[in-house]
């Protein structure tokens, strides 16, 4: 693997095997409430299995890239202690698992837990929509600012995993998740980035959901570059999506200057682990499958990253484009649902796929 000489970049992208899930991980082991000692042991063993799968990819050609692991202390402390010795960068979460509002897993003691493992990256996950109640947004921003201040004072690098789930009104206006993801989420993400940056929250890396179009990805990337320090960058998260969907997101992101890798977890290991726990595969077979999924996404990213300039434009249409016809009335409904979350006017139609713009314009002329 490439020797680490600084933060990830286009020349040295970072490919993270994410396995920091805790509450959702427990559902695979039948956990209800607090896990038993037997369940804890099984989950910790499973995290070691996932890491073993990641290690099998360590000898693959990376074209300057580097590998990383994102793992939690609760279930993955043994893995965390082995990561850097194996040649991977270590990222660890600070947020409590399974909460809608961001809180620190270890409360005021979070710095001590970070320092005990000394990770290359500290990670926080937040769910944040500009249309959320003001009190919730203020509280979450304050928590992130506290982490940001700690990172600055201790000279630690940190990444923010930002999820922008639709409000009920936004989802109702879009009528389905696919339309929300394509036509509303990128612009709402821009608003979150500016709101957080204005409050002094400036992670080194924004860990973001994938975007269906080049226009959407560029919109968000431009916000990251304009709102925060110029060296800020983005990586793509996997969202437990099927392989073809993650491939599409990587195809969109990799050619764009400012995207510097990915952090994909369940799309690599969830189904192999389910099969292993059901007795349909042994440990060696499971490690091999996890490794191959991980390698696949690395190859996909590197192939897209090396595409000739301008080729990414051909990827603007989303994979499996099936959402309903966007009429002017629906456009107006989406705008209304997102009103107040879009003071900079970045919502539709400025970055919409050109095919949809032409369709809407034609309908306007007819009307």
Task: List each model region and its residues.
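Alpha-helix-loop-beta-strand connector modules within alpha/beta enzyme cores
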Residues: 84-95, 140-158, 185, 218-234, ...
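A glycine-rich, aromatic-flanked flexible loop/lid motif
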Residues: 223, 264-268
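Conserved, mostly hydrophobic/aromatic
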Residues: 17, 161, 206, 265
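Alpha/beta catalytic barrel-like cores
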Residues: 1-136, 202, 232, 244-247, ...
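Glycine-rich beta-to-alpha transition loops that act as phosphate-gripper elements at the mouths
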Residues: 236-244
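Alpha/beta enzyme core
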Residues: 52, 56-61, 108-121, 129, ...
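Short, ordered loop/turn segments at secondary-structure junctions
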Residues: 127, 162-165, 211, 239-240, ...
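Short hydrophobic alpha-helical runs that function as membrane-insertion/retention elements
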Residues: 160, 235, 261-263
